[in-house]
């Protein structure tokens, strides 16, 4: 058994197993695309404790129509944090032996952290009804930094929505997933030269592209556009869990 416990192998193996269950048709029924029913629905109709006071639009907290504001990331309606993060580290993390230190968050991880690091107000959006740099009034936010993600049970408990900028007690992101990492770890899937598994088809693991949608998408955020594990590899905020078990 390779060295583990909060290392990447445990995470990677679990993710691959989960994706394989989906591929076999067992887990698909437990999730459905319905962001309005999730805690990521921050509109006034949201079922969570963090939601708008009056704003009824569901998508506007993250997304904006094409060309609604010049000079911003297409379809993204929030500023990105300029914080420097302390990445996850562990003596049992094989990726540290290869990368020396994990890269700064990139891709979808930066998008997630624009809310979840707690440095930016949840209601601050780039465009709202044609008005740039608008603020949506929110309820249920932090008592320490009003408007930002609430602390929940605390960053040291592992049960918080507010991750902060110190990611050492979270799980690895910005991990470059290569055959070298898989070989060193011993439990990860051995991707091919295009970072795909199964080799050639990459139905489960790979970098998303036109006509190619792996179930665990790596993101081309690494050096030389190598595929990396980011938040969006495993997490989709648009999916509603429908299985109470």
Protein language model features and the residues they cover:
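Bacterial N-terminal signal peptides
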Residues: 12-23
